[in-house]
UniProtKB/Swiss-Prot annotation:
It comes from the Bacteria. This is Phosphoglycolate phosphatase. The active site is at 19 (nucleophile). One of its GO terms (cellular component) is cytosol. Pathway: Organic acid metabolism; glycolate biosynthesis; glycolate from 2-phosphoglycolate: step 1/1. It catalyses: 2-phosphoglycolate + H2O = glycolate + phosphate. Specifically catalyzes the dephosphorylation of 2-phosphoglycolate. Is involved in the dissimilation of the intracellular 2-phosphoglycolate formed during the DNA repair of 3'-phosphoglycolate ends, a major class of DNA lesions induced by oxidative stress.
Length: 272
């Protein structure tokens, strides 16, 4: 039985919200290269890709602080040093995304959902300046009507503000929505928003199995959401989706737009 059949018997969700890094794309090679360039420029030893793989998931500022600390706990890192290091990292990371790849099954799944008329959004803790160009480079940006970066709103995951925002903008309730991610932050945000959550086992999650975070469902291939797509005789052969008409234009949510809806969103503000 497919993931959708288990989570939404007899129907499909009307809205699917996705995380980005560790869910749709493997960006760690580029992130690790930027982290190592940053550390070398500061006279430090490089961290290496495996360490960076365990540090990602909470946004660039936290990644940089973990790199400076050499581990998950970054409480001892000096704020001034971290701010300077972040500037160095952002410049290094913005220079290249050549090592980033889309995970197997992602394009097939997005294409299938688009064909079924399911609305899709992207909610990531990655700084918004990198998100749209990266999606375009990976050729998957056209599938998302709402794109929210980690610095778009005042809050980022695990706060559910972005999920509430997208559901408000789409007019689709939590009961007909789904969040797909790979980390504890994703699961906590989905639970706080009252949304079912699919956890992907191949993601990052700081080196811990995603099942430990108790998402609604755990899968190891995004195509397992789709009824019958991974049956022995099944094969997805969908044509490329047409560009969205102007009435369904992609919305890259910016800080200016956020200020216009802050009053509507405030009543959903999550308090830990």
């Amino acid at each position: 039985m497919s993931g959708f059949e288990q989570l939404f018997p007899g129907q499909l969700p009307r809205l699917v919200m996705f995380d980005l890094d560790g869910t749709l794309i493997d960006s760690v090679p580029d992130l690790a290269a930027a982290v190592d360039n940053m550390l070398l420029s500061l006279g430090r030893k490089p961290a290496g890709i495996e360490s960076v793989r365990e540090w990602v998931g909470n946004g660039a500022p936290v990644l940089v602080r973990r790199a400076l600390a050499g581990g998950i706990d970054h409480s001892s890192v000096d704020d001034v040093e971290a701010e300077h290091a972040l500037e160095v990292f952002m410049e290094a990371y913005g220079a290249s995304h050549e090592l980033t790849v889309v995970y197997p099954g992602v394009r097939d799944t997005l294409k299938w959902l688009h064909k079924q008329g399911v609305a899709m959004a992207l909610i990531t803790n990655k700084p918004e300046r990198f998100v749209a160009p990266l999606l375009d480079q990976m050729k998957i940006g056209r599938y998302f009507k709402w794109i929210i970066g980690g610095d778009t709103l005042p809050q980022k995951k695990p706060d559910p503000a972005a999920l509430f925002f997208v559901m408000k903008m789409s007019g689709i309730p939590a009961s007909q929505s789904l969040f797909v991610g790979d980390s504890r932050s994703d699961v906590l945000a989905a639970k706080a928003a009252g949304v079912k959550c699919v956890g992907l086992s191949y993601g990052y999650n700081h080196g811990r199995p995603i099942a430990e975070e108790s998402p609604t469902l755990v899968i190891d291939d995004l195509r397992k959401l789709i009824p019958g797509c991974l049956d022995t005789a099944a094969e997805i052969t969908l044509p490329d989706a047409a560009q969205s008409p102007s009435g369904n234009a992609i919305v890259v949510v910016t800080r200016k737009l956020w200020m216009k809806v802050i009053k509507a969103l405030a009543r959903w503000r999550w308090r830990a």
